[in-house]
Regions:
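Metal-dependent nuclease catalytic cores that hydrolyze phosphodiester bonds in DNA/RNA
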Residues: 1-109
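Nucleic-acid nuclease catalytic cores
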Residues: 91-179
Length: 180
């Protein structure tokens, strides 16, 4: 498998072409993440774990100690075994690697769920979702819907955390180059 681009590299390039070039050709000059950036990553992981509870009884593709090819193979194995929800489902098409936060499969159609820890849907998230759609469509999957799940900034927690109120989904079912 010869990867040319990942989802994160694609969105990095959309945000800053110089950053993409440096990431590919001169990694040593990039500033490593500071504690603030690490906290943002950790917050994203927490929100992602909460979002998985909206799609119970799923299986997770492990990140540690596996190659991307292992992740792709395991994803296909889980699909073949009939799992309805797969967390971090991994695919490659046309040299592009993607990991879908939550892949939901119903009636031979797939729903992509991209989880973000922000309170609104930014354009870069739509590009992120678009490349996931491109890859799955290219692999022959029938993509029913793409969702960007994010924090509801109007949510006020009561005694118990209500994940269905904390997280909102913005749904995109019309596809062009960019989901609109």
């Amino acid at each position: 498998m010869k990867l040319k681009l990942s989802k994160s590299l694609y969105t990095r390039g959309l945000q800053c072409q110089k950053s993409l070039w440096l990431k590919k050709h001169k990694k040593e000059v990039l500033t490593p993440p500071n504690s603030s950036a690490q906290a943002i990553f950790e917050n994203g992981n927490i929100v992602g774990d909460l979002a998985c509870k909206l799609f119970p009884n799923g299986v997770e593709i492990p990140f540690e100690n596996t190659t991307f090819q292992d992740k792709i193979t395991l994803t296909q194995d889980y699909i073949n075994q009939g799992y309805e929800n797969i967390y971090e489902a991994t695919f490659e098409f046309d040299g592009i690697l993607i990991m879908i936060d939550i892949l939901n499969i119903k009636d031979n159609r797939v729903i992509l769920n991209e989880v973000k820890s922000s309170t609104d849907v930014k354009d870069v998230y739509l590009h992120d979702a678009s490349i996931q759609y491109y890859v799955l469509n290219g692999l022959g999957y029938d993509v029913k819907q793409v969702n960007v799940i994010h924090i509801n900034n109007n949510y006020v927690r009561g005694e118990e955390l209500d994940i269905n109120q904390l997280l909102l989904g913005s749904f995109y079912t019309t596809f062009g180059f960019l989901l609109v």
